[in-house]
Amino acid sequence: ESARKMTEGRVIALFGSAGLRDKEKRRLMAEISAELADLTVLTAEDPRTESLSEILSEMAEGAIDKGGIENETFWRVEDRGQAILFALQLANPEDIVLVCGKGHEQSMCFGKIEYPWDDRIATRAALGEFLGVDDAPEMPYLPTQEK
């Protein structure tokens, strides 16, 4: 609701749900996003030892329950860096893109491995790629880049 007050354009929300944590929140977060955001991108957020595709499926069910239409009003993009770039590509100049969930955190857990990750750096890298900036930071590595 606060984001809606910041723009006359669309609100594009990007977020995931951590593995082995708050399973009951997954559907709820996607339901709320389907109701309040214009577009939603579901992605990785510390899946740990859970299947990322299963986490995203649970979230997608919540979006669908509230009228979300896959590949029209919401998308699943496993790689968080590519998800950020995709959200930027969806945006028009007057839209707002919210990259939610990781905040100040400095890593992302896949399996039992913590990979260095910073949403701020990843967003700068995605913006650099989107805008064709030569000296933009490199996108941090995640194992989902290998798919």
Cite the ranges covered by each PLM segment:
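ATP-dependent carboxylate-amine ligase
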Residues: 1-147
